[in-house]
Amino acid sequence: MPRRRVIGQRKILPDPKFGSELLAKFVNILMVDGKKSTAESIVYSALETLAQRSGKSELEAFEVALENVRPTVEVKSRRVGGSTYQVPVEVRPVRRNALAMRWIVEAARKRGDKSMALRLANELSDAADNKGTAVKKREDVHRMAEANKAFAHYRW
């Protein structure tokens, strides 16, 4: 770790259609091999489908789905005197969003629907309804943290 100074977060440009930095980050996470326009069209198509299903605006529906997947606590390995403990720690807000988006994209990629846009729309729809693989992942992480609550005093 460098000792000179803390490097700040890079500013990312908001997405062109909705002007949301969160959505731009989501597009970047979905993007494969630098094909941003493909990733954008997949995300916008999925959001359109999601908005039709939920009856909310695209951005609002996306925000609800993301909120249901965001983890509040996670476990980190900490070595204390020869044994490794899984210590529960609170997740920083930026990391919460990053993890939630990553989990949604991973879950969508594992689904068996026809197109990626449909898979993403279905996963976001499930997340908005508090079900689906991404929500299950969050619950597993929370369960691990709850199970290891006894080691919380090893926090650093």
UniProtKB/Swiss-Prot annotation:
It holds the Pfam family Ribosomal_S7. GO terms for biological process: ribosomal small subunit assembly; translation. GO terms for cellular component: cytosolic small ribosomal subunit; ribosome. The keyword rRNA-binding applies. GO terms for molecular function: mRNA binding; rRNA binding; structural constituent of ribosome; tRNA binding. InterPro entries: Ribosomal_uS7, Ribosomal_uS7_bac/org-type, Ribosomal_uS7_CS, Ribosomal_uS7_dom, Ribosomal_uS7_dom_sf. Disulfide bonds: none annotated. Keywords: Ribonucleoprotein, Ribosomal protein, RNA-binding, rRNA-binding, tRNA-binding. PROSITE patterns: RIBOSOMAL_S7. One of the primary rRNA binding proteins, it binds directly to 16S rRNA where it nucleates assembly of the head domain of the 30S subunit. Is located at the subunit interface close to the decoding center, probably blocks exit of the E-site tRNA. HAMAP family: Ribosomal_uS7_B. Part of the 30S ribosomal subunit. Contacts proteins S9 and S11. Binds EngA (AC Q9XCI8). Belongs to the universal ribosomal protein uS7 family. This is Small ribosomal subunit protein uS7. The lineage of its organism: Bacteria, Pseudomonadati, Pseudomonadota, Gammaproteobacteria, Enterobacterales.
